[in-house]
Amino acid sequence: MEFKLNFNMDNAAFDFAEGEIVRILRQVEERLNVGRDSATIMDINGNVIGHWEIED
């Protein structure tokens, strides 16, 4: 089993990168807690910037 998380940080949402990374990781945590095994990652501005998933 493998957990993969990848997102692009080349936009204005990452001017304060640490805060945006924490926000994204909390969002991933919330989805894992409700049983999700994958999702698209969006930045604070609504742009699709990546994906995470659990693979067998």
Language model feature labels by segment:
Residues 33-56:
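Short, intrinsically disordered low-complexity segments
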